[in-house]
């Protein structure tokens, strides 16, 4: 199992913390450039590799955290990479702004999805992006190989990504893990 998380300046580390902890032994951090990345929490991260060094055939799951993704909208390298992954049926998981990146690139066109902080909201300024998506009022949505989630559902998002990775022995294992994440006794 090879799981990649994508780092970009302004990403929200908390949205992927459970994924990184649970899948750490399978995890590689990738970024557009080999440089220190600063999260919205002002933590510094050094990626393991760059996108240009990653072979899409070697990726099982690619996770895009939210945060402040506006600088990624023009990242043609990321867009091309995601479309290669999608063509190969690889799992692409985006939460909050990560799902927004997927939507902006057109990756979610014709798909069931949700994202941003409180769910995708169509406005006159963004309808050219979101009108092609079947926006679902759910915290986490899986449509084929694509997983999207709203920010506050980072625990549920982590569970869905772990399900895609096949780490749970059964559904009760997933439920118990979610209860542990949320401190539900």
Regions picked out by a protein language model, each given a short descriptive name:
Residues 2-6, 10-11, 17, 21-35, ...:
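Active-site-adjacent pocket-lining segments in enzyme domains
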Residues 40-42:
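N-terminal strand-loop element at the rim of the active site
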